[in-house]
A protein has these predicted regions:
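Short C-terminal tail/terminal secondary-structure segment
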Residues: 2, 232, 243-258
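The beta1-alpha1 cofactor-binding region of Rossmann-like NAD(H)/NADP(H)-dependent oxidoreductases
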Residues: 41-42, 62-74, 101, 225-226
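Short, small/polar-rich loop/turn modules that mediate ligand/substrate recognition or access, typified
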Residues: 177, 182, 242-244
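A glycine/serine/threonine-rich, flexible loop-to-helix segment
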Residues: 1, 49, 53, 149-151, ...
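Catalytic loop of short-chain dehydrogenase/reductase
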Residues: 95-98, 135-164, 169-178, 190
Length: 258
């Protein structure tokens, strides 16, 4: 299927590794021009080079999304470099701790306000698109609690903010729909990639790795590409009547009826 993404202009936050990198690469493979950001300047430059090697326009900047002014300024600059904006993918996450004031603060500033500031900067640009889409990366931690893979309370901070984001995007779908902007959430389950959290748990012999794998009904961890393909679909004209959805990608790990 041709998703109709060729020539579209996309911004992806937190896009130099894991899910974010796979999203940026997949969008570029589909012919999108792509802007990316992350904190590490070396990784940003390497990702830009990889994307540009696919024959599309690629731009990026090293920044911390907790700096709302810097994030908004970069989104405006990136859209200018790309010739406009059709797609915003908000992916960055702090993954900061299980509890404590600092964990709450970092997740609030990074996950929640990072997304809010990105949307605020992007919406005036997306209104000019005619086929605009926002895709927020959340987590199954937002939709299910109390299973036996993690200790009680382990995901309370992370899950709380991912749930807030899911609600935020659902509200955006309603408020931005009349402006021609769709908004959807993707909630991944356990995604494995080198250097990622599930790779580290495997290397450490953490029992959470074994327990999670045993509960995934498809018998394997997800890959970043599994998430990226779903994001590409939701961002594309092929999903032109999909808005306000939360697409769970977890290999039937969760037992919740969506």
């Amino acid at each position: 299927m041709d998703l109709g993404l060729k020539g579209k202009r996309a911004i992806v936050t937190g896009a130099t590794r894991g899910i974010g990198r796979a999203i940026a690469e997949t969008l570029a493979d589909e012919g999108c021009h792509v802007g990316i950001c992350a904190r590490d300047p070396v990784s940003v430059e390497a990702t830009i080079a990889s994307l540009a090697g696919k024959g599309v326009t690629a731009t990026g900047r090293a920044l911390d999304v907790r700096d709302g002014a810097a994030l908004k300024g970069w989104i405006a600059a990136a859209a200018d470099a790309l010739g406009g904006l059709d797609i915003l993918v908000s992916n960055v996450s702090a993954m900061a701790g299980a509890s404590g004031d600092e964990a709450w603060r970092r997740n609030f500033e990074t996950d929640l306000m990072g997304a809010v500031h990105a949307v605020e900067a992007a919406v005036p640009l997306l209104e000019k698109s005619g086929a605009a889409a926002i895709v927020q990366i959340a987590s199954i931690a937002a939709i299910e609690v109390g299973h036996d893979v993690f200790p009680d309370g382990y995901l309370q901070v992370y899950g709380a903010f991912k749930a807030a984001l899911t609600n935020y995007i659902a509200e955006l779908a309603r408020t931005l729909g009349p402006k021609g902007i769709r908004a959807n959430t993707v909630s991944p389950g356990q995604i494995y990639f080198p250097g990622g959290v599930w790779h580290r748990r495997e290397q450490e012999g953490n029992p959470m790795h074994r327990k999670a794998l045993a509960r995934i009904r498809l018998g394997r961890f997800g890959r970043p590409e599994d998430v990226a393909r779903a994001v590409a679909f939701l961002a594309s004209p092929a999903a032109s009547f999909v808005s306000g959805a939360n697409l769970v990608i977890d290999g039937a790990f969760t037992r919740r009826v969506n």
